[in-house]
Amino acid sequence: MVKMTLIARVTDGLPLAEGLDDGRDLPDSDMYKQQVKALFKNLSRGQNDASRMSVETGPYVFHYIIEGRVCYLTMCDRSYPKKLAFQYLEDLKNEFERVNGPNIETAARPYAFIKFDTFIQKTKKLYQDTRTQRNIAKLNDELYEVHQIMTRNVQEVLGVGEKLDQVSEMSSRLTSESRIYADKAKDLNRQALIRKWAPVAIVFGVVFLLFWVKNKLW
């Protein structure tokens, strides 16, 4: 059964549309939505090259399609046929491109195409029951194959992003520490110069003062 559906722009991870009633009766729905956001973040960084992938998470599987810089993602039960999940996404993709194609790149706010929820709900109902003649025919369609689509674990996929975040954080910390070290080095050099030349400056100052006083008296 289809549990959740989201559409986002790949270039920046901006959510464009979603099924509004998704996740209402789903335990830990917030956790899964956070995982989806993390997946979109990874995709915006170009960390997953596959245009089609399945990502296992607990008792569910995320399936997604990337096309035209847009990611179409759904979360289904593990028992739900992979073939139907991707055909469901194909239907969403075709309609979304037809209706919103020219405006996708210029969308500036989250869920700019929230009205697309109507089509999501209508299409989801068609795919919920895998035993209907329509869906059985789709499962038997030999022209649409999903065997080549990779399946990975969510921790494996998100772990890549976490490691890159750690590297980025470490790099920022090292840069900050290098700046602090450079500033301290400048201060130490300045203090060393003062200690080196201060006595000389004092001697010259005393000599100059004595010379000036002598001239005044004479």
UniProtKB/Swiss-Prot annotation:
InterPro entries the UniProt entry points to: Longin-like_dom_sf, Longin_dom, Sec22, V_SNARE_CC
Membrane topology: Single-pass type IV membrane protein
Listed SUPFAM superfamilies: SNARE fusion complex, SNARE-like
Tissue: Mainly expressed in flowers and siliques, to a lower extent in seedlings, and barely in roots and leaves.
SMART domains (alphabetical): Longin
Keywords: Coiled coil, Endoplasmic reticulum, Golgi apparatus, Membrane, Protein transport, Transmembrane, Transmembrane helix, Transport
Intracellular or extracellular location(s): Golgi apparatus membrane; Endoplasmic reticulum membrane
Topological region Cytoplasmic: 1-192
CDD domains, per database record: Longin, R-SNARE_SEC22
Ribonucleoprotein as UniProt keyword: no
Keyword Transmembrane: yes
Gene Ontology BP annotations: embryo sac development; endoplasmic reticulum organization; endoplasmic reticulum to Golgi vesicle-mediated transport; gametophyte development; Golgi organization; pollen development; protein transport; retrograde vesicle-mediated transport, Golgi to endoplasmic reticulum
One Pfam family per UniProt: Longin
Domain Longin intervals: 6-120
GO CC terms of this entry: endoplasmic reticulum; endoplasmic reticulum membrane; extracellular region; Golgi apparatus; Golgi membrane; plasma membrane
Membership in a protein family: Belongs to the synaptobrevin family.
Assembly and oligomerization: Interacts with SEC24A.
Function noted in UniProt: V-SNARE involved in vesicle trafficking from the ER to the Golgi complex and required for early secretion. Involved in endoplasmic reticulum (ER) biogenesis and functions as well as for Golgi-stack integrity. Essential for gametophytes development. Involved in cesium Cs(+) accumulation, a non-essential cation.
Protein name: 25.3 kDa vesicle transport protein SEC22-1
Organism this protein belongs to: Arabidopsis thaliana (Mouse-ear cress)
Lineage, uppermost ranks: Eukaryota, Viridiplantae, Streptophyta, Embryophyta, Tracheophyta
Originating gene: SEC221
